[in-house]
Amino acid sequence: MTTNNLVLSGTITRSRRFKSPAGIAHSVIMLEHKSQRYEADMLRNVYVQIQVILSGPRFESVAEDLKAGVEVQVQGFMTLQQGRNGQNRLVIHAENVELKT
């Protein structure tokens, strides 16, 4: 088995909730991450915007709190998702979320 695990913190910029035709609750957030990291002994600004998908009953208790401006830390795995326009994009499927504010 190969490793695919990511922990990322940031601020929610957009969120939406819906239920699938099978009745599964989903929350989709856009997470904005800003930080500074050292690379090759130089400080580098890091900026990422990535979609995070939270699916199933384990996230229903926090779903109402996942609004723009809220800081969170998510842990999950990355995968490609094909958009309606046919373009592939990298997304995170959350396995855990922690509210920071």
From Swiss-Prot:
Any GO CC annotation of this UniProt entry: primosome complex
The keyword Cell division is assigned to this record: no
GO BP terms in the entry: DNA replication, synthesis of primer
Coiled coil (residue ranges): none
Domain SSB positions: 1-101
Top-rank lineage group of the source organism: Bacteria
Keywords associated with the record: DNA replication, DNA-binding, Primosome
Role: Involved in the restart of stalled replication forks, which reloads the replicative helicase on sites other than the origin of replication; the PriA-PriB pathway is the major replication restart pathway. During primosome assembly it facilitates complex formation between PriA and DnaT on DNA; stabilizes PriA on DNA. Stimulates the DNA unwinding activity of PriA helicase.
Family per record: Belongs to the PriB family.
HAMAP family: PriB
Description of how the protein assembles with itself and partners: Homodimer. Interacts with PriA and DnaT. Component of the replication restart primosome. Primosome assembly occurs via a 'hand-off' mechanism. PriA binds to replication forks, subsequently PriB then DnaT bind; DnaT then displaces ssDNA to generate the helicase loading substrate.
Name of the protein described by the UniProt record: Replication restart protein PriB
Organism: Shewanella baltica (strain OS155 / ATCC BAA-1091)
Lineage, uppermost ranks: Bacteria, Pseudomonadati, Pseudomonadota, Gammaproteobacteria, Alteromonadales
